[in-house]
Amino acid sequence: MNLGEILSSVKLPRPLAPELAQTEVTGLAYDSRRVTPGVLFFAFPGSKADGREFAADALARGAVAVISESLAPPDLAARWIQVEHGRHALALAARTFFGRPDERLGLTGITGTNGKTTTAYLTDSVLRAAGGVTAMIGTIEYHLAGRVLKAVNTTPESLDLLQIFSDLLRAGGTHVTMEVSSHALALGRVHGLNFHTAVFTNLTRDHLDFHGDMERYFAAKQMLFEGAGGNPPRFAVLNTDDEYSRRLRLHARTERLWYGMTPEADLRPRHIVSSFKGLRFDLQFRKQRFTIESPLIGKINVYNILAACATGFSYGLAPEVVARGIASLKAVPGRFERVDEGQPFVVVVDYAHTDDALRNVIAVARGLNPRRVITLFGCGGDRDRAKRPLMGKAAAEASDFVVLTSDNPRSEDPLTIMNDALVGIRRTDVAHVVEPDREAAIRRAIKEAREGDIVILAGKGHETYQVLKDKTIDFDDRAVAREVLKGYGYHQTQ
């Protein structure tokens, strides 16, 4: 494919020189280290480095041209193509280069603050129950037709995303379910893609260090339902109990499927039974009613299940297929995940890292009628500082005992982060301890537990690392908790 063909959908300020337009392109790259002769290099600013600084290196490695928002340096002008939006150009060029694979796949995008990951796992399970050959892309990992790949971002860069789509098609793939983060929408990583179904879970405070305020955060989420540079989705799956869902602007051609607890919802649960064994309820879908059973714990997961069911219906799946897919998902890593060594109390690990998510996970625990709830949490560094006291207050108001510790401090002083959260805790009279060493904090939380208690280790969930100021270390809340329990003499026997 030549350069002119690859850039045919990209708006250029001036036509390409005929000789340049006819140049054959063998691949695309946004990292100069991946450039080989014949590759087209896209140079745009990243979070840690600016690709424009590596343009000369890319050309020296054999790049056919450089695509950038910036004016061309005089010495590179002959092979420099200026565009209005570098990431949009990459997304559109990659889509052309890989033959528009999104048009040949059932593409579902799931956005919102909480519940994206669980909803994605459930949706993927439903589609596989229908016989689909699927990919799932999200926070924990990427699944590609039975293979598991490490997740770099919740939503990959557009080039990597389209490569996954292309690989899936070659493997006989039919559907992709993906978490679509607000960062990905704002940065154009899904620009130009055609989604069959767009799902909105909810919107609460998060990522304001990036977006600035809630309206900008919401505006980023809105982009998925407007088409994000492609056609608007055929279906929008919306939470009738979330105020931001009701504010979304939708294209007239987009069919709405509402889910929630209110009578006007298209999908509504009846007779919910929640226990340590999971969930069971009757699902009312318009004039149909059938039973849903799931091993997932907690009424908050009813919303995630409803969203996944609605997505299945958007693809025309039968209720019995949808129900089978929901029942077959046994657990989601790091989402109310139990650590069981036969102890007389419950220990769970959960990814909750906002005040709303903390309230939700503690509410799930309360719904299981424990003697006490002991909550361990921390706040991430280099993120929205204003949410820290809100998280402290949420944990303190809903728990019987709180252990405040470090999360991923990144470049910040862990004690400064903890002091911010402590402001919220001290607005209550809850018993609490402060322990900056996360391993020692987990030991303290478990030591506090007695028969009938639930210990929640919140914030890191599935993560197997901790990001410190000058390094990243191996750290898994689940593994640490298991070793602590064994150290106290507990050991699960089969």
From Swiss-Prot:
Family in the record: Belongs to the MurCDEF family. MurE subfamily.
SUPFAM superfamilies the UniProt entry points to: MurD-like peptide ligases, catalytic domain (SSF53623), MurD-like peptide ligases, peptide-binding domain (SSF53244), MurE/MurF N-terminal domain (SSF63418)
HAMAP family membership: MurE (MF_00208)
Protein origin, superkingdom: Bacteria
The name this protein goes by in its record: UDP-N-acetylmuramoyl-L-alanyl-D-glutamate--2,6-diaminopimelate ligase
Function: Catalyzes the addition of meso-diaminopimelic acid to the nucleotide precursor UDP-N-acetylmuramoyl-L-alanyl-D-glutamate (UMAG) in the biosynthesis of bacterial cell-wall peptidoglycan.
Keywords: ATP-binding, Cell cycle, Cell division, Cell shape, Cell wall biogenesis/degradation, Cytoplasm, Ligase, Magnesium, Nucleotide-binding, Peptidoglycan synthesis
Cofactors: Mg(2+)
Pathway connected to this protein: Cell wall biogenesis; peptidoglycan biosynthesis
GO CC field: cytoplasm
Cell compartments where the protein resides: Cytoplasm
Enzyme Commission number(s) from the entry: 6.3.2.13
One Gene Ontology molecular-function label: ATP binding
